[in-house]
UniProtKB/Swiss-Prot annotation:
Leader sequence residues: none
InterPro entries in the record: Tuftelin_GRINL1A/MYZAP/CCD68
Organism encoding this protein: Xenopus tropicalis
Chain intervals for the UniProt region annotation (Disordered): 1-21, 40-65
Any single biological process term in GO: intracellular signal transduction
Protein name per Swiss-Prot or TrEMBL: Myocardial zonula adherens protein
Domain of life: Eukaryota
Family according to the record: Belongs to the MYZAP family.
Compositionally biased spans, kind Low complexity: 1-18
GO cellular component: cytoplasmic side of plasma membrane; I band
Length: 485
């Protein structure tokens, strides 16, 4: 084994021929780092010895991890050998300074002439030998522990085989028990079919809900599209009003510049322009009222659609509550099934104990009967296992149904938020419409009824009408801009 933390690493290996004539001791050696100052031949031998010792330590680590039980069973020869050669051919000759000289020679046939001489202190060799003895003792303890565990496992296997053989007694009781198990399996089959039907109904309702959600999405897209179109129309009308306002300003400038020169011509022109702009204003007012009525109708339709959607959401919530109640009933049923399974397992354990007592008394007098009872017991165990699988499957189904209901609740909550936002926007638009209507009514009420008196009656009339047109255009422009915002 390897010892870490020393300047030179020494590994021992006991073999059948460890005792050699002349007091020679065989050791496995890894060269120290200070040997780099030696001649070139010694460096080559050191590299080969280090590689060989790494391989040997890897093999010994595998042995220590459990691949081989003990180092004493290895039949491989050591890779390197260390021989302590006594001084003057005497077996007990050691240097006066406590140093042991060793000769390292390869065991291969093609390296018989490679020999290297090294030296170690006796204290270091003693420490390495004590470390190796401790490691061997620990390995022996581990081997004894492993063999003891193996014997315990054999005894446990024997006990288990005896317990399996013991479970083949009292045929009549087991037959009645098997009938009870078969009836329980039939009831569980009916429960499984009812659960499958409930899951199919739930899937159908989920499909209906998805279709309703898609219809609501399409309606919301149509509403958004119509709202965008109305905004575009309002922008166009606002542009027309801006152009009319600019024309009015130009006409006002022209009228002011040519008041004294062409009173009659300007009067006729202003009358024509006034009639034209008054006609345009009436048309714009009619269009505005028509668009306003259309928007009111659209808002009513939207409110109706929102009410329908809220009604559908309420129905979906009622369905979800019903499904929650069904899931609670299924949970109770699964709990009762688990309690029944535990009760049956307890009965099976008690009957097995009674069978064991009877078997100890009867000492296996009827092997055919015992074989039949063993078959019945195995069939009962299989049925119990099948029952456990069914309970586990039902629990999975219930969990999946609960997850689907939670997801559906989240979707319904999201739809409620969306409907609330739409209602807020509709209320905001209605408030803006009422505000605009109030402004228009106020401006129409404050419109001047009499013309201002000036020197030129025609110009005064034209100026008052132009001012009225300008005020109406400004109010319409403000209303359009506010509504577009």
């Amino acid at each position: 084994m390897m010892r870490y933390g020393s300047a030179a690493t020494v590994t021992t290996s006991e073999t059948a021929s460890s005792q050699k004539p002349g007091g020679v001791c065989r050791l496995r050696l890894t060269l120290p780092a200070e040997a780099s100052l030696r001649p070139k031949q010694e460096e080559i031998n050191r590299d080969t010895s280090v590689n060989a010792d790494i391989r040997s330590t890897n093999e010994r680590r595998k042995k220590r991890n459990g691949y081989v039980l003990s180092e004493k069973n290895t039949a491989e020869p050591p890779t390197l050998h260390l021989y302590t050669i006594p001084k003057n051919n005497t077996p007990s000759a050691v240097a006066s300074s406590g140093v042991v000289y060793g000769v390292v020679q390869r065991a291969e046939n093609n390296h018989q002439n490679e020999v290297v001489v090294y030296e170690w202190s006796t204290n270091q060799l003693k420490e390495e030998m004590n470390y190796i003895k401790d490691v061997r003792g620990t390995l022996e303890k581990i081997r004894e522990k492993m063999f003891g565990e193996y014997d315990e496992m054999k005894q446990k296997v024997k006990q288990l085989t005896q317990e399996i053989k013991v479970s083949s007694v009292q045929k009549e009781f087991l037959e009645s028990h098997s009938q009870a198990q078969s009836t329980a399996l039939d009831t569980f089959g009916t429960i499984n079919s009812s659960l499958n039907a409930a899951s199919i109904e739930m899937q159908k309702t989920l499909v209906d809900m998805t279709l309703e959600n898609t219809n609501i999405k399409d309606e919301m897209k149509n509403i958004k599209h119509s709202y965008e179109e109305s905004l575009v129309r309002l922008k166009e009308k606002q542009q027309l009003l801006d152009s009319a306002q600019n024309e009015n300003q130009l006409l006002k400038v022209k009228i002011e510049s040519s008041q004294e020169a062409n009173a009659e011509v300007m009067r006729e022109m202003t009358r024509k322009l006034y009639s034209q702009y008054e006609e345009k204003l009436r048309q714009e007012e009619l269009k505005y009222t028509a668009e306003k009525d259309m928007l009111v109708d659209q808002t009513r339709q939207y409110l109706k659609a929102i009410e329908d959607a809220s009604e559908k959401v309420r129905l979906a919530e009622n369905k979800i509550e019903e499904r929650d109640a069904k899931i609670a009933e299924l949970d109770k049923l699964v709990h009762r099934m688990e309690q029944e399974r535990e009760h049956l397992q307890d009965q099976l354990i008690r009957h097995e104990e009674r069978i064991q007592d009877l078997d100890n008394r009867m000492q296996m007098q009827s092997p055919d009967r015992n074989q039949r009872l063993e078959e019945v017991a195995t069939s009962l165990r299989e049925r119990i296992k099948h029952l456990d699988d069914m309970v586990h499957c039902q629990q999975k189904k219930v969990k999946h149904m609960i997850e689907e209901i939670e997801l559906l609740k989240k979707k319904v909550h999201y739809k409620d938020l969306l409907i609330q936002q739409l209602l807020e926007r509709i209320a905001f638009l209605e408030g803006e419409n009422t505000e605009l209507q109030d402004k228009v009514d106020y401006l129409m009420a404050n419109k001047p009824k009499t013309d201002k008196e000036t020197k030129d009656i025609g110009t005064s009339c034209n100026l008052s009408e132009s001012q009225r047109i300008l005020t109406v255009c400004v109010t319409e422009n403000e209303a359009r801009s506010i509504f577009s915002i």
